[in-house]
Regions:
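Extended non-transmembrane interhelical loops and adjacent amphipathic helices
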Residues: 113, 186-187, 283-294
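ABC ATP-binding cassette signature C-motif
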Residues: 1-253, 308-542
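Proline-centered turn/helix-capping motifs that create local helix->coil transitions or kinks
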Residues: 130, 277-281, 291-301
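A structural signal for long alpha-helical coiled-coils and helix-turn connectors
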Residues: 103, 241, 270-273, 277, ...
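Short amphipathic coiled-coil heptad-repeat segments
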Residues: 136-142, 267-271, 287-292
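ABC ATPase nucleotide-binding domains
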Residues: 251-265, 269-271, 278-287, 303, ...
Length: 542
């Protein structure tokens, strides 16, 4: 168990949260949610002991082991991958090191023997005999193959390094598990595995995530950071969202009725207060008026962008036709003989390795050329492309208004500013350099650029990356209303499943040859499809 007592934190005059009394109990998974900048990650750091609060304290149950998903993979550069995972259980790793050091001594004394016996007992109590196999299982489940377990962490790519740190946090069944964005750099199947792992986890989990499907699957409670408080709700994210929206509408409706009643009473009092025959009634109405109080509806720190894709030109019947497409990268065939067509209004998800799906979307956009094959877009197509890597677009000192002007025929500042405003850029924010934007800000700028183009076909590669829950919800709602055609690649299961009715997988045959699978089904159905699981060597989820 972990709890807080009168926990407060502020930086200068800015209060993130104050007097937070909250208890997180075993057997529950708590989704820590809130707008960007509300203090979610900072609250998590307070719980982990990495951030000193302004006042109050964090209380951890006696003998409880707390594990945190760390971000400092450079600290393990010179460590073997499997060993880095074992280091997640500090006490066990310390016992293992001392035990190995004693057994490695050339002159083994009686004192060494006594100490070794103590360590063997502690090693057994900590399930040390199964430690390496458990660590290896975690790594394999997170898509790090066995042959890489003995490599130094510095030899892994950045995505693998992050997954090693996740395995490290999960290792050894900690009593309290703190996870900040654990699904980052995970493929869809690793995310689904993590969902099942946390669903079955018996101890306390507190997690920050922008993945709604993930939060819905793993969370028994939601802890909402808003209004400088941390408020606990039972239920998963969707239940919290629906109930909080309902409660807000009810308070707003109640206030509207009260405001109407106030107007009615004021009008009566003003009209008849000087009328002798009506003075008693006017006095009664005045008394009623004084008793009516409006609910104090505080403005939330949450802000939702306004995402809508207007299509100025209607699509014809022919949207896209391609055949025989092939792409090779560093001598590896990503895909070959890829051919399919897309109809007006059709919404398609691309599945497969990230490298392959990004390569195909880049080819479809015209940004790169295929090694073989051809593709043809319909004459009425106005294409909008969202690349996964948007950094090249922001390698400039232009401010945001001038950055947007590059993509607009209408150069008037008010026109360009209106699109930035839709994506929550206002005032002086529009004057800052495009080169200093955060990942989420860059994505919002790219979406503003897309809206400016009035596309009737969208190619989206990882559009929810770096976005907060509010922006993802706004984008999702905007795409649900989009009448054009769509091809999307994303690890956000709920986002994709809500949009598509067809999945094109850049997969492979049993003997490893690239093959396209064109499947008319929802994304959830695709993920559970037994044939897909068999192709990728995955066990069917219970």
């Amino acid at each position: 168990m972990i709890s807080t007592e009168k926990l407060s934190l502020q930086f200068g005059s800015r209060v993130l949260f104050e007097n937070v009394d909250i208890k997180f109990t075993p057997g529950n998974c708590y989704g820590l949610i809130g707008a960007n900048g509300a203090g979610k990650s900072t609250f998590l750091k307070c719980l982990a002991g990495e951030q000193e609060p302004t006042s109050g304290k964090v209380v951890i149950g006696k003998g409880q082991r707390l594990s945190v998903l760390r971000q400092d993979h450079f600290a393990y550069d010179e460590v073997e991958t499997l060993t880095a995972v074992l280091m997640g259980h500090e006490r066990l790793y310390r016992v293992m090191k001392e035990r190995d050091a004693i057994y490695a001594k050339p002159d083994f004394s009686d004192e060494d023997g006594a100490r070794a016996a103590e360590l063997e007992g502690e090693f057994g109590e900590l399930n040390g005999w199964n430690a390496e196999s458990e660590a290896a299982t975690l790594l394999s489940a997170l898509s790090i193959p066995v042959e890489r377990h003995t490599k130094l962490v510095k030899e892994l790519d950045d995505g693998e390094k992050v997954r090693v740190l996740l395995a490290q946090a999960l290792f050894g069944a900690p009593d309290i598990l703190l996870l900040d964005e654990p699904t980052n750099h995970l493929d869809v199947d690793s995310i689904l595995w993590l969902e099942n792992f946390l669903y079955d986890f018996k101890n306390t989990v507190i997690v920050v995530s922008h993945d709604r499907h993930f939060l819905d699957k793993v969370c028994s409670h939601v802890a909402d950071v808003d209004f400088q408080k941390v408020t606990l709700f039972s239920g998963n994210y969707s239940f919290w969202y629906e109930s909080s929206q309902l409660a807000l509408r009810q308070r707003q409706d109640s206030n509207k009725k009260k405001e109407d009643k106030i107007k009615e009473l004021k009008a009566f009092v003003q009209r008849f207060s000087a009328n002798a025959s009506k003075s008693r009634q006017a006095s009664s109405r005045k008394s009623q008026l004084e008793k009516i109080t409006l609910d104090d509806i505080k403005p939330s720190s949450r802000k939702y962008p306004y995402v809508v894709f207007d299509t100025q030109r209607e699509l014809g019947r022919e949207v896209l036709f391609c055949e025989g497409l092939k792409k090779t990268l560093d001598g590896v065939v990503l895909f070959e003989d890829v051919g399919f067509s897309m109809a007006r209004g059709e919404k398609i998800a691309l599945a497969g390795s990230d490298v392959a799906t990004s390569a195909l979307i880049s080819i479809l956009s015209g940004e790169t050329k295929p090694d073989a094959g051809e593709l043809r877009w319909g004459r009425t197509v106005n294409l909008g492309y969202f690349p996964k890597d948007n950094d090249p677009y922001f390698n400039t000192q232009l401010n945001l208004i001038d950055w947007m002007r590059q993509f607009s025929e209408n150069k008037e500042e008010n026109f360009v500013r209106s699109f930035l405003g839709r994506m929550l850029f206002s005032g002086d924010e529009t004057k800052k350099s495009a080169s200093v934007l955060s990942g989420g800000e860059k994505v919002r700028c790219m979406l503003a650029r897309l809206m400016l183009a009035d596309p009737n076909v969208l190619l989206l590669d990882g559009p929810t990356n770096h976005l907060d829950l509010e922006s993802i919800t706004a984008l999702n709602n905007g795409l649900l209303k989009f009448p054009g055609s769509l091809i999307v690649s994303s690890h956000d299961v709920q986002f994709v499943d809500s949009l598509v009715t067809r999945v094109i997988e850049l997969g492979h045959t049993a003997d490893g040859k690239p093959k396209l699978y064109d499947l008319h089904m929802t994304y959830e159905q695709y993920l559970a499809d037994e044939a897909r699981l068999a192709r990728w060597g995955l066990a069917k989820k219970p």
